[in-house]
Amino acid sequence: MSEKPSRNVVLASVGAMVALAVAVFVLVMRLPEVVGLGSRVKLPIFHGASTWVDIMLFLLLGITAAIFLVRRDDATYAWVVGLRAVAMPLWAVNSVMGFIAAMNTWDFTGSSQSPLVVARQDPRLTAQLVLLLGVAIVLLLDWLVHEKRIHKAMTDLAFVALAAVMLSDIFLDPAKRALHPDSPVLNSGWDIKGPFFAIVAAWFACMLVGAWLVRGFVGPDVEPETLPAEK
């Protein structure tokens, strides 16, 4: 197992994360207003970008967990730890942002039901909540139940498979998009799409640096000796 990052490397990495986060903030604030929503469109766009980033992190987590199940080496498992530590909490943040964005931007005029009841009918919000429950279960198993790394990695892989099935079903079936417009960002002009893709790139880079830092500090301390049963 490699040594933990030096103080200078940590400071440089944290500085890079701060710079990337600031870049994301500036990009979000400079998004143009749109007819109807005005400046309220900024939160949904950032939520969409952050969700894209989290889906990519889940994909990397699943791939890394699968590689570890084959190789059973410390270095790969350190990346499993780092990606898990970043991707799982980010989904919780994204779930909260998604709910706030829905309540702030959807038009409930003329509905006889409360906004909460209407929002609950959106398959995308429902999927977010189901996967949020899955995140909680994965973290609880990781912290309180599983002791062997192989069991932790198998749980990660099972969660990623569940997320892939649920999200693919929603994205591929137009009938399940419910209240959510069909690709509102991708159907916009480049004054929206350009900043959106820049936000995705910067936010993804920020999360990867965070995963790398966790890998460096937490990974070496999590069962550094490969158990004989895992060989």
Cite the ranges covered by each PLM segment.
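Polytopic transmembrane helical bundles with strong interfacial aromatic enrichment
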Residues: M1-K231
